[in-house]
C-alpha cells in the first residue's frame, strides 16, 4: 500500500481548514484516511502556535513505515524539526540568461571603448 502524509481539506467555502492525515495515495484527497496526525489552519497568523499542530510521535512512526509526505507537508515537517531539509540542486539558477549576458557584454564593450581611446591618446 502506497502511503502518503498529506492535507485533507475541510472547512466551508473561503474558510479553509486542513487535517494532516496518513492515507493511501489512491484514496481521494478528502476521502478515507487511516489516521489523523494533526491540523493546519492557514487563516491564523504565521507565528501562531495553533496554525500547525501535529502528533510528532505518530508522524515519525508513519515516516518509519515508508509514508511519503507531500511537498507542503514536508515543508511543515522541516519547520517542526521532524525531517531534514531536502537539498535541491539547481546550479543554473543564479546564472543570467542569454539576453542578459549579451547586454552585459555590450555594456562592458561600451565601457572599454572610451578607456582604450584615452590610452591611445596619451
Curated annotation (Swiss-Prot):
Matching Pfam families, A to Z? Ribosomal_S16
Which GO terms of the molecular function aspect are on file? structural constituent of ribosome
Q: Name one GO cellular component term.
A: cytoplasm
SUPFAM superfamilies named in the record:
Ribosomal protein S16
Stretches for region Disordered: 81-122
Q: Which UniProt keywords apply?
A: Ribonucleoprotein, Ribosomal protein
Presence of keyword Ribonucleoprotein: yes
Fetch the InterPro entries from UniProt.
Ribosomal_bS16, Ribosomal_bS16_dom_sf
* Magnesium keyword on record: no
Q: State the signal peptide span.
A: none
UniProt record, GO biological process? translation
- In which residue ranges is the amino acid composition biased (Basic and acidic residues)? 81-90, 99-109
Family, as annotated: Belongs to the bacterial ribosomal protein bS16 family.
NCBIfam families cross-referenced by the UniProt entry: S16 (TIGR00002)
Q: What is this protein's name? A: Small ribosomal subunit protein bS16
Q: State the organism of origin.
A: Roseobacter denitrificans (strain ATCC 33942 / OCh 114)
Tell me the organism's taxonomic lineage: Bacteria, Pseudomonadati, Pseudomonadota, Alphaproteobacteria, Rhodobacterales
Amino acid at each position: 500500500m502506497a502511503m502518503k502524509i498529506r492535507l485533507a481539506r475541510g472547512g466551508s467555502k473561503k474558510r479553509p481548514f486542513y487535517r494532516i492525515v496518513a492515507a493511501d495515495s489512491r484514496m481521494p484527497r478528502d476521502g478515507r484516511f487511516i489516521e489523523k496526525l494533526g491540523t493546519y489552519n492557514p487563516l491564523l497568523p504565521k507565528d501562531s502556535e495553533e496554525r500547525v499542530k501535529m502528533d510528532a510521535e505518530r508522524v515519525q512512526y508513519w515516516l518509519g513505515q515508508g509514508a511519503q509526505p507531500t511537498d507542503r507537508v514536508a515543508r511543515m515537517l522541516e519547520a517542526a524539526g521532524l525531517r531534514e531539509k531536502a537539498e535541491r540542486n539547481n546550479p543554473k539558477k543564479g546564472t543570467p540568461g542569454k539576453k542578459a549576458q549579451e547586454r552585459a557584454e555590450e555594456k562592458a564593450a561600451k565601457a572599454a571603448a572610451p578607456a582604450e581611446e584615452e590610452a591611445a591618446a596619451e
